[in-house]
């Protein structure tokens, strides 16, 4: 989409060669290092886009290149061009300067503080000055002089200024004159294409009256820029505004939208927001989408050895001082959403934005009648309707696209005409509605029967859970008694052998055998390798059907095995490995917040239990203190050189994966993810099994869990046996997010080891 860069293009901030990024609202081209600082400032200061790897509207790119070639950078460095500035000691950054603090301080002073912009003479009333500047902008946009308009905007002119005498805004004037680049600049600074002038006309109306068709179509795209960007982020498609399609509501590829009561309540709360609050939330989500997409481009284009250098990382949205602290905190919490949660939020916002724009009420009973009639006509045409199909599969929702086929539109109009006509109801129409009601009643009865069965199974599982809790308490008491016996018998060495002591763990050592942790919420600690022996199992809970929500269970695994009644710790190594392999193969693939990592077995039982505990804990906060009594935290950390070498190996493999994603080579996902997983395992092996630092443990947990989650996501990219289509775009976004988490964890480990080894 972007034009070929000229050989004499340099970075506007440090004069470095071959800039590959653009600051849209500043009209400048910048290099990678300066771009990292721009991103840390936030979109309210600088809106950065990659020149080659980001889709550009042609006129927007033309506007940026025109401003850059005509010296727009001199607007932001006006006082530096004055020879007197050399005497004052102020100078521009050089390519050889460090990013921190040299380049970062200069860029903040240039764009955030506007320290080098030409200042007008001071006046007593700033509002009068802004009004005069806005009037000048109103007059200047009818010409093609972009630099003058950008200079006025930099001094405080308002892009949405309504001229009291002429009764219009600058965008009305630019549209009437056919100045499409001026319209792009005004839109970047917040001009609204839907504003009406004193005659009740919008800029789109003036563009169409003047015969400026391209400008009119572009103004419509700008008007729907927010929803278009959100839809493109999820499914890689944009609505066809030329043909009247203004919204696309994507659907989850695996139909895994969260249908829990909490999700439904959140959606109702979203729908109850006022238009003003809903607009603020939508803009915040738009900024988060921009941050995530820019992160993906950044990871795909950078030399990944720079991940351990001083370039700035943007893990969440920067603070905007114009917003309240509550809103800034909410904006930053958006970064904590995983790919599935964020996609669900975006879909809800798109659906409600469409409803609000069309003025549709929350109640849709009339639409339901229409949809019943459409279903009846389909039943008569096919005669083979599947009654086992849930209701929501045959009922359309706000996720339907606006463009429908002519045949379906005609059928709907006929149904509406027959339903809303004032004439008598025919026998055929009466029978159709009657059959539809009978089918609905049959489905309702079937669902009630299924609900009763599930309620019975739930009661059975609750009873089994109580039984397991009582057995758990009994085992704890037995372990405590055994510990007391071991302590008493320790004075009689001739009666107690070393092997018997080894077979009697202490009370604290038996704590990892807990079947159910009441304080761990919905993520219990489930050891591996000890409970997966069918000959020693007492009770095994049956799994819920696949359509039952996660809130009904206390664990996400398919079965809940109990512990053996006798503690036989003397199995041979082959039996333990076979048990672990069986458990690994029986674990179902689930969401990545439930993914378990299975480490290699150690030679001793204590080492194996310690590693299983550290890798399988899925609660919040630090790991629970359930390790062996004699386990001592190891303060030793590997050398910085070894960690950097392993990190470079990881980032090299991530770069290959991102290159495959960029070239749509989905069959390369799994080999790349396996190499990344192997590199992560090698890096994790450098660190002690129980690091002393909580930060190291947290980073290692994030590193290994993200690598395992990456393998799971890469498998989804290959076409499987499922009849549901795979949303490759969404899978790719999730793969990139996992790769970013791995890179972030690796950099954290490099930073920690560097700091610890240098101190």
Curated annotation (Swiss-Prot):
Keyword terms, alphabetized: ANK repeat, Coiled coil, GTPase activation, Metal-binding, Repeat, Zinc, Zinc-finger
Ranges of compositional bias, category Acidic residues: 385-402
Coiled coil: 451-478
Compositional bias ranges of the Polar residues kind: 469-489
GO cellular component, one term: presynapse
Biased segments, Basic and acidic residues type: 570-583
Residues of the Arf-GAP domain: 1-124
SMART domains on file: ANK, ArfGap, GIT
Zinc finger annotations (C4-type) as residue ranges: 11-34
A biological process from GO: behavioral response to pain
Positions of ANK repeats: 132-161, 166-198, 199-228
Region: Disordered, residue numbers: 376-422, 469-641
A Pfam family of this chain: GIT1_C
Domain of life: Eukaryota
Oligomeric and partner information: May form heterooligomers with GIT1. Directly interacts with protein Piccolo/PCLO. Interacts with PPFIA1 and PPFIA2. Interacts with ARHGEF7. Identified in a complex with ARHGEF6 and BIN2. Interacts with PAK3. Interacts with PXN/paxillin. Interacts with TGFB1I1. Forms a complex with EFNB1 and GRB4/NCK2.
Protein name, UniProt field: ARF GTPase-activating protein GIT2
Organism: Rattus norvegicus
């Amino acid at each position: 989409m972007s034009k070929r860069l000229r050989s004499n293009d340099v970075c506007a901030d440090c004069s470095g060669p071959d800039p590959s990024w653009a600051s849209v609202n500043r009209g400048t081209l910048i290099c990678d290092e300066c771009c990292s600082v721009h991103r840390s400032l936030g979109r309210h200061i600088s809106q950065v886009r990659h020149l080659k790897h980001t889709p550009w509207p042609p006129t927007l790119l033309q506007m940026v290149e025109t401003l850059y070639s005509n010296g727009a950078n001199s607007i932001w460095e006006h006082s530096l061009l004055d020879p007197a500035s050399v005497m004052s000691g102020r100078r521009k950054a050089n390519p050889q300067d460090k990013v921190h603090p040299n380049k970062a301080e200069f860029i903040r002073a240039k764009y955030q503080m506007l320290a080098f912009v030409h200042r007008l003479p001071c006046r007593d009333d700033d509002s009068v000055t802004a009004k005069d500047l806005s009037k000048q902008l109103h007059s200047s946009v009818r010409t093609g002089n972009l630099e003058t308009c950008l200079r006025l905007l930099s001094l405080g002119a308002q892009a949405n200024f309504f001229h009291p005498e002429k009764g219009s805004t600058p965008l009305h004037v630019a549209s009437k004159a056919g100045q499409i680049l001026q319209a792009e600049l005004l839109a970047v600074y917040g001009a609204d294409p839907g504003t009406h002038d004193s005659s009740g006309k919008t800029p789109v109306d003036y563009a169409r009256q003047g015969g400026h068709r391209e400008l009119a179509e572009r103004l419509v795209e700008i008007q729907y820029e927010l929803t278009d960007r959100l839809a493109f982020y999820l499914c890689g498609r944009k609505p066809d505004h030329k043909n009247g399609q203004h919204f696309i509501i994507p659907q989850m590829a695996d139909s895994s939208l969260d249908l829990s009561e909490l999700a439904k309540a959140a959606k109702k709360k979203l729908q109850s927001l006022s238009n003003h609050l809903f607009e603020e939330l939508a803009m915040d989500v738009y900024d988060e989408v921009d941050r995530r997409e820019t992160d993906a481009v950044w990871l795909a284009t950078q030399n990944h050895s720079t991940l351990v250098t001083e370039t700035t990382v943007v893990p969440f949205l920067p603070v905007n001082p114009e917003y309240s602290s509550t809103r800034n905190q909410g904006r930053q919490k958006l970064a904590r959403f995983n790919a599935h949660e964020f996609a669900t939020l975006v879909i809800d916002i798109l659906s409600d934005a469409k409803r609000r724009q069309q003025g549709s009420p929350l109640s849709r009973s009339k639409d339901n009648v229409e949809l019943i009639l459409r279903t009846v006509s389909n039943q008569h045409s096919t005669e083979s309707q599947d009654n086992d199909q849930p209701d929501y599969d045959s009922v359309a929702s706000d996720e339907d696209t606006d463009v429908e086929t002519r045949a379906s539109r005609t059928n709907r109009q006929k149904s509406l005409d027959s339903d809303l006509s004032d004439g008598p109801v025919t026998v055929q129409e009466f029978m159709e509605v009657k059959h539809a009601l009978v089918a609905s009643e049959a489905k309702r009865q079937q669902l009630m029967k299924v609900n009763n069965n599930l309620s019975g199974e739930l009661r059975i599982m609750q009873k089994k859970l109580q039984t397991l809790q009582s057995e758990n308490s009994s085992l704890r008491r037995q372990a405590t008694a055994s510990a007391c016996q071991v302590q008493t018998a320790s004075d009689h060495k001739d009666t107690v052998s070393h092997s018997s002591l080894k077979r009697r763990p202490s009370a604290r050592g038996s704590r990892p055998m807990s079947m159910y942790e009441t304080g761990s919420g919905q993520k219990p600690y489930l050891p591996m390798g000890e409970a997966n022996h069918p000959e020693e199992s007492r009770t095994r809970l049956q799994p819920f059907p696949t359509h039952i929500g996660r809130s009904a269970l206390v664990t996400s695994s398919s079965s809940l095995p109990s512990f053996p009644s006798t503690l036989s710790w003397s199995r041979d190594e082959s039996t333990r490995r076979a048990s672990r392999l069986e458990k690994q193969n029986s674990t179902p693939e689930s969401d990545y917040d439930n993914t378990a990592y299975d480490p290699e077995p150690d030679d001793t039982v204590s080492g194996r239990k310690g590693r299983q505990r550290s890798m399988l804990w899925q609660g919040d906060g630090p790991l629970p203190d359930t390790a062996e009594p004699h386990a001592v935290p190891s303060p030793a950390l590997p050398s910085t050189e070894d960690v950097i070498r392993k990190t470079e190996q990881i980032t090299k493999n991530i770069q290959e994966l991102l290159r495959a994603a960029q070239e749509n080579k989905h069959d390369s996902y799994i080999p790349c993810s396996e190499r990344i997983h192997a590199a992560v395992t090698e890096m994790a092996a450098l660190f002690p099994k129980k690091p002393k630092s909580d930060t190291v443990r947290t980073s290692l947990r994030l590193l290994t869990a993200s690598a395992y989650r990456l393998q799971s996501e890469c498998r989804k990219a290959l076409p499987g046996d499922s009849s549901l289509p795979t949303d490759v775009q969404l899978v790719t976004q999730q793969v990139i997010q996992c790769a970013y988490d791995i890179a972030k964890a690796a950099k954290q480990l490099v930073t920690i080891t560097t700091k610890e080894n240098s101190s």
